[in-house]
Amino acid sequence: MRQLCRPLTLPHWWQDALLALPRIVCGYLLAANFGAAKFGLPWSPPDNNLGLFEVAFWFPQDVAAYGGIFALFPNFFAWMGAFSEAIGGVLLVLGLLTRPAALLVCCTMLVAMFMQQWQQGLWNMLPAAGFLWAALPALVLGSGRFGLDYLLTKPAVPRLRPGLVALAVAALLLPGCVQPAHDKTVVYLLDVSGHPNVQQVGLRGRDKPLSWDSDLLLTPIRKDSLYRAVVTTHTGYKVTEVKFTLNGDFELKEKANRRILFGPADTTVYRARFDVVPR
């Protein structure tokens, strides 16, 4: 273990500092943003409702769509991918277990590039490719002078016992699970009175079956006045985000999306006026 973690140091300290910069920035972005959004950490967004070390409910579904072995074990690969980003990012920042963390990040980014983003063109592959290139020097060189590995692998530091390392890893892995998801129904009641020439009233949103690309049409209760839609979402989140459209045009342009908080019951009623900012 000590040999695996012992970093290679360059002749001058500033060279190690220069190589530590992309490692630390990469790790911070993964741990604080990309990973924390789908893997339960103390700083994960509260609205995502993730328990500690839980992977977001939607991620195994995305992984299963890759096919092959990913479809056979979607929960495992989803959890490992999210773990690699979130916990691997923390380890990269600290320079602790740097090579294993960098290996996990590299594998995850390769999967993201070729299984998820390949069909969407080279431009969409750039974020994952950027994390891959940032992790590669850490995979080869370790943490350099600027990391905990440099301190912990010095001869004066007591050797880590493999049993204790295995116990720590097991303690970290055991709580991991997939976030539970439930059907949540929202009844949308939209007042469009005062808006002339109402031909079509739609709803777009973040969570399936809604999308930001196409309208779910609302049904008129009182034509040119009150419209209604009932949407059931299978989710583990506490909130969803939507916007209404009128004749294909978005409301609240250049303003934040509407945030609907799911109530404790399975059905929530949401009343709104078109293009009026909710209080």
Model-identified regions with their sequence ranges:
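Bacterial Sec signal peptide processing site at the extreme N-terminus
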Residues: 177-189
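Aromatic/hydrophobic beta-strand junction motif of beta-rich domains
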Residues: 50-51, 188-193
